[in-house]
Amino acid sequence: MTDAVTSTGIHVLPVTGIPEIHAGDDLVRALVRALSPADGTPGGDLRDGDVLCLSTKVVSKAAGLVIPPEDKQRAIAASTVRLVARRHGARTTTSVVEIPAGPVMAAAGIDASNSPDGLLLLPEDPDAAAAHLLEGITALTGRRIGLVLT
């Protein structure tokens, strides 16, 4: 993105114009469109060396990794490599678990926020998901960038 790296540090710039993503949407094309200037050059706002940070939530939405709320405990159990802790509250119990990709997180990373269709699961292989997105963005823009799933 223009002026993203300077000799004195980095600049963090938001990507605007990404539509609401749904299961089956082409996330690569949506990102490239959002990163394209008014002249329509695909990804024209990207520069070699830029790093795009993208939430796993949007990747999960595009991949259709949605389950109904009543399946939450079953999904946590299926995603658990190791139970790290269990916290009992007044109304709920939260499990902190290690998931197959390696991170340790509450509820196996299952997320209900901004997901009106149900609960979002994390991608099974976030590295492969990031590589797929990066390959697509590079193919459409010709830019050599980095990509981090957050």
State where each predicted segment sits.
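N-terminal and secondary-structure boundary signal
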Residues: 1-150
